[in-house]
A protein has these predicted regions:
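Tryptophan-centered motif/residue detector
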Residues: 6, 42-43, 135, 143, ...
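Helix-centered, glycine/charged polyanion-binding patches within enzymatic domains
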Residues: 70-159
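Polybasic low-complexity intrinsically disordered regions
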Residues: 1-98, 105, 112-114, 168
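Charged phosphate-binding loop/patch that engages nucleotide di/tri-phosphates or the phosphate backbone
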Residues: 164-181
Length: 181
């Protein structure tokens, strides 16, 4: 699994409860937290005000779906969640262990390596370079951006914004299934 968040600007019709300002991404709006499988399809989704940090948003999303991890047998291999460098593993682990102490027996968090400027120059690349395996979550975020209703937050509530995000992925998965001969 791979996790990421995406800050999205609000339009004028968004309610005060759904507004927040993300200083890191300089965005006034909401954050979409997304955990996807290796195909880029959503496993868990959550929308929060943009002032909620990536760590807290991921913890909220996992706590809302904690029964998935509680029901997972110990005999199965650990689930690896690949995150970018915007997440702080020590904070994540301490918050999740307070909710479910056995979580580390079933889940393993891993930060994706950030390419240095020298490594980029060696490859002859500049600017944003997708990290190995992280391109899947970046592609999922791009799929959401292709849905016209998700380019900005047009919804009044966070529940409606989450429903729109889920609906976008349902449409995408149905299109994929219909394309199979």
């Amino acid at each position: 699994m791979m996790g990421d968040s995406q800050a999205v600007k609000n339009t004028c019709c968004a309610s005060a409860a759904s507004k927040g300002f993300c200083f890191y991404k300089v965005t006034n709006g909401i954050k979409r937290h997304l955990l996807v499988d290796i195909l880029g399809f959503p496993f868990f989704t959550l929308c929060t005000p943009a002032n909620v940090s990536d760590d807290v948003g991921l913890v909220m999303m996992l706590v809302m779906n904690i029964e998935y991890f509680q029901r997972k047998p110990m005999s199965e291999p650990k689930v690896t969640i690949l995150l970018d460098n915007g997440y702080h593993l020590d904070k994540l682990i301490s918050l999740l262990q307070a909710v479910y102490p056995n979580i580390l027996k079933k889940v393993r968090f891993e930060l994706s390596p950030k390419p240095s400027k020298q490594a980029k120059a060696k490859q002859g690349k500049k600017g944003f370079v997708p990290v190995k395996a992280r391109w899947v979550i970046e592609r999922s975020n791009a799929w959401m951006e292709r849905c016209k209703s998700l380019t900005k937050n047009y919804e009044r509530t966070l529940a409606n914004a989450k429903a729109k995000m889920d609906l976008c992925f349902v449409r995408l998965m149905i299109k994929r299934l219909a394309a199979v001969p």
